[in-house]
Amino acid sequence: MELRFTTSFEREYKKIVKGNEVLQRKVRKQLALLAKNANHPSLRLHKLGSSKYWSISIDPSIRVLIILERQWIYVYHIGKHEDVY
């Protein structure tokens, strides 16, 4: 599936990974895995209640919110667990 990034995600991404190359690599790795296999166990993909959003884990504290569609994955937000939920 192909990833589509929102403006808000791009803005949040730049802010959260600024100066942190390790986190940058983790985010890129998990997003590449998401595009290849959204059901991979390391993503810890789960639906957020009855909303249209799904969540994946980047590491124990960082989450990315997405919307799954037929041929696209819309990447909406990135942030700390408590901020994104």
Regions found by a protein language model. Name each.
Residues A32-I56:
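A short, surface-exposed loop/turn module that caps and links secondary-structure elements
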Residues E2, S8-K15, E21-R25, I58-R63, ...:
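Enriched for short, Lys/Arg-rich terminal
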Residues M1-E12, L33, R44, L48:
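Charged, low-complexity, helix/coiled-coil-prone segments
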Residues K26, L34-K36, S51, L68-Q71:
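Low-complexity, intrinsically disordered/propeptide-like segments
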